[in-house]
């Protein structure tokens, strides 16, 4: 019988998963396979991106010190995926989106394993399972300066959404109130405490308006507004093409057709291994159960964790 794996961190959102890395990787790879199956059945386009793309080219699989899988999806396909998920049963998998759950603090979607439990941040407690990140890829302005301005506008909305989604302690509220420079944040968080759901809907509508400003099919440039690489998230749509397949563990996955231009744009010499001290897992994990789904109420009953 396989030993149960339940891990928790009482003070921070950092959790070492080295001892369970093999099982972790196998689980997220299975999630990717399920996602690929959905895309094949509905003729949806996606590309592996970021560290996952480097992993495919340099390691032919998950980077040994990486701990997630990321894909980008053209906006028309992404919007179709959101609709498909509402009417289709994916068995042990589910699509988690910011439109369906007020407790979900992010602004892109994840395909998640219902048979596992993961809380990434105690400040923004949301129960999901192990996952693959799905980032929408939006058309943007042909002029790169205007594309930057749009990125800045979008980021401001993201920052407001982050503020609304973060749960502060009473002491933290008092600290904000005591500092006149923080009164603006105090006002936002107080309003969010009472009106979180309508404020979230309004912010998401603002983000969607920016995302749909341009016709994807006619666009010269595309942009991952929800990505974490700043202005590098804008690049020529022509780089994507029909995709180029690479071995990734025991499957093949698509990368942008001009994958070398794409990866050098983001990472420079991506074939060069980073220094040893930078080969670390970077994602948040406050609570993890690899064996079953728990509710937030169940997790809070554990005496040694406060979420």
Which residues fall in each region the model found?
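Accessible peptide chain termini
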Residues: 1-2, 15
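Acidic, Ala/Val/Gly-enriched low-complexity intrinsically disordered segments
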Residues: 3-6, 10
């Amino acid at each position: 019988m396989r030993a149960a794996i339940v891990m928790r961190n009482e003070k921070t959102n950092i959790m070492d998963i080295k001892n369970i890395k093999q099982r972790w990787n196998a689980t997220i790879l299975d999630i990717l396979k399920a996602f690929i199956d959905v895309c094949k059945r509905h003729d949806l386009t996606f590309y592996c991106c970021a560290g996952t793309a480097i992993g495919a080219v340099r390691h032919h699989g998950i980077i040994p010190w990486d701990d997630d899988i990321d894909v980008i999806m053209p906006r028309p396909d992404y919007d179709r995926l959101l609709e498909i998920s509402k009417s289709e049963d994916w068995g042990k998998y589910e699509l988690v989106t910011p439109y369906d759950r007020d407790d979900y603090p992010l602004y892109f979607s994840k395909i998640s394993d219902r048979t596992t439990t993961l809380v990434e941040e105690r400040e923004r407690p949301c129960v999901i399972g192990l996952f693959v990140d799905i980032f929408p890829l939006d058309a943007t302005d042909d002029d790169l300066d205007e594309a930057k301005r749009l990125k800045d506008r979008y980021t401001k909305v993201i920052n407001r959404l982050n503020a609304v989604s973060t749960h502060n302690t009473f002491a933290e509220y008092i600290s904000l109130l005591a500092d006149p420079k923080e009164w603006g944040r105090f006002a936002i968080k107080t309003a969010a405490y009472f009106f979180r759901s309508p404020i979230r809907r309004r912010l998401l509508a603002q983000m969607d308006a920016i995302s749909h400003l341009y016709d994807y099919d006619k666009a010269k440039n595309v942009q991952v507004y929800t990505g974490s690489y700043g202005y590098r998230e804008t690049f020529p749509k022509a780089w994507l093409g029909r995709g180029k397949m690479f071995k990734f563990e025991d499957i093949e996955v698509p990368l942008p057709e001009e994958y070398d231009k794409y990866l050098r744009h983001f990472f420079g010499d991506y074939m060069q291994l980073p220094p040893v001290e930078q080969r670390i897992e970077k994602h948040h994990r406050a609570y993890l159960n690899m064996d079953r789904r728990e509710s937030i109420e169940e997790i809070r009953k554990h005496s040694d964790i406060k979420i």
